[in-house]
């Protein structure tokens, strides 16, 4: 099963479908008049995963991330980039994911980013 993302005129993902065969981008685009790009359900941060671990064959990694509604397709990177979660976060161009300006605390607690305080706050 392959997955395909429909792009709008601004390269925003507006729809994602599953289809039975590979390499249907051109066929979907021609038949619907919309632009479609294949996306890999098992790709995240430029790494392809099988059963939750990086796959031995990384040639299956496709467009950095599985496309979701609201993601952007970046033609120059050939990548799906998720929406920016906070204004202060920075795009890691190597993996096409947004990173916080401060690393997540590693003390085992559950934290959430507080944009106003520009810090991680313990979730209670």
Language model segments and positions:
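Interaction-interface detector
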Residues: 1-124
